[in-house]
Amino acid sequence: DKIPGQVTASALEERGMQAMISAWYAPQGDLISNEEVKGWVDEYPEQFYGMCSVDLRDPVQAVKVIRQAVQQDGFKAVRIVQWLWELPCSHALYYPVLATCVELDVPICLQVGHTGPLRSSETGRPAHIERIALDFPDLKIVCGHIGYPWHVEMICVATKFPNVYIDTSAYKVKRYPAELVQYMKSNGKQKVMFGTNFPMIMPDAALEGFEQLGLDDETAQLFLAGNAERVFKL
């Protein structure tokens, strides 16, 4: 069953949080439509920002959808879940989407690392992120789910390219790899963003043990809010 927008908005409001909420499109159709996301954002503008998604099989229509979502409906990013399509982000079908993100100056949000469902993890390898970062140097790329078991490679890609970022969605604090925490404390303090993967992980559970990371005040603020505010222009 779908989680009602009111439940999500209330959970965020109680904790003084805001969230990006994403549409999901797959070959079988929309799992969460752009229209649903727009409805939630319109109803709870203090809690939600929208991310649109598209059908990769129709690149011309995908470009039209993105332009409307960003220019008319105020969406802040585009999200594609690569394993749903069984195509890495370096595949040609993504390129009209990526070019449109550059044109409109909005980030593309992708998943890196292994897949939870029984689907190939090949689409989540950071090498595909490197390929599109080379081809689209002005494209802002937000890589969700940390990238495990290739998280060190993901950190290298984020370090190499100024517009590549990592978010921690789907991981509780206690599961953050040590290499990621060290990156956050050093040259990666402006490159890592907090995420939850709500409702799979609730905000309180995602942040449990946060103080044990030992982040200074500046780094903690950037991680929890500042980096996302800057990259997504919130």
PLM-predicted stretches and their roles:
Residues D1-Q18, R67-Q68, S186-M193, I201-L234:
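Mid-to-C-terminal alpha-helical segments outside catalytic/metal-binding sites
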Residues V7-A11, S33-W40, V65-A69, L93-V97, ...:
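A general structural detector for well-ordered alpha-helical segments in enzyme core domains, enriched
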Residues L12, V37, V41, A69, ...:
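Conserved, mostly hydrophobic/aromatic
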Residues R15, Y44, E103-L104, F136-P137, ...:
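Helix C-cap/helix->beta junction micro-motif
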Residues Q18, P27-L110, H114-T123, K174:
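Active-site gating/metal-coordination segments in enzymes
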Residues A19-S22, Y49-C52, K76-I80, I108-L110, ...:
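Hydrophobic faces of well-ordered beta-strands that scaffold small-molecule active sites
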Residues Q71-K76, A127-C143, F161-D167:
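Structural recognition of alpha->loop->beta junctions
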Residues K140, G147-A206, Q212-E218:
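Active-site-adjacent C-terminal substructures of enzyme catalytic domains
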